[in-house]
Amino acid sequence: MRGLLAGLAIVLMLSSCQTDKEQKPSPTPSAYRGEVTLGSKSLTEQYLLMKMSALLLKDQGYKVNEMVFLDSPAIRSAMEAGIADLYWEYTTTARIFYHKQTPIFDPDIAYREVSRTDAGNKIIWLAKSSFNSSWALLMRKDISEQLHIYRISDLADYIRTQRTKMKFATNAEYLQREDGLDRLKEIYDFELPDDQVVAIESDLLSQTVKDGRVDVAVGMGSDPRIKKNGLIILQDDRKVFPPYEAVPVILEKTLEHYPDIRTTMESLTPYITNENMLDLMYQVDILQKDITKTSRDFLVKNKLLAP
């Protein structure tokens, strides 16, 4: 789901106390709280989550090291080995790939179960955000409004009643997944012949919808090109897609040593929403803004950091 890759990770250590040009002067000895290592997968959304977390913890007096890992197995292994203290994980990633369990489609139950399982691994899941980096059905906003299609149920009703041959695009992975296109058609009760489905590269999905070459795409809800291309995400009202809600996870021993990290992280979590993350990724990926400045401006705007 998250583009997991096998093998050894390529890890880049970023010592924020040395490389962050925007950092304040090092905290005085009396303000110094300790040293923690934050991790990130190699994704823009993860860079943003790590950077915002690092800025807040540095503001609280921590020396923060930032490490970027190639993929999910690498960062999980680093946490289990005690190399990384904290990073942001996704509920269904943990459920499927770490715990080797079938997906749970209710977000609250999924969060509860991965939290319970990882407690036995000495890994603590803090409060979850509402940012859901999962699959999504994408449609042009103007066509959605014209046809009054705002939910996947609306789309299914339209296909059934209008007998229309709408064309879908997705990537090869979704076509092959057990919980992929066949589940979508079953849960929402509509037919979609093979000749109405095309498989293309993930990076091209939103552009293909924008250009009108297809009517709908099944892509990632965290793609910043959704905003750029004037698309909307149809509401998944029957929960066909498993939740990939982003949650800060921390080693139990680190949290015991620095219990105030929970408060710091949970001050940020309510602001990690789909809308905010899409906007932040749009600024970084599309407008090419600096990720540290973008993160700091967001925290200042929401009064989590002083100007």
Regions of interest found by a model, annotated:
Residues 98-126, 213, 225-239:
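Ligand-binding "clamshell"
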Residues 13-16:
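C-terminal motif of bacterial Sec signal peptides marking the signal peptidase cleavage site
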Residues 109-167, 252, 270-274:
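A conserved helix-loop-strand patch within extracytoplasmic ligand-binding domains
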Residues 163-236:
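Ligand-binding pocket segment of bilobal, Venus flytrap-like solute-binding proteins
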Residues 53-60, 151-194, 296-304:
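Ligand-binding cleft/hinge of the Venus flytrap
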Residues 30-45, 62-68, 163-170:
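Short, well-ordered beta-strand elements
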Residues 18-21:
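Bacterial signal peptide processing site
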Residues 44, 62-77, 172, 194-207:
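Short helix-initiation/N-cap motifs at beta->coil->alpha
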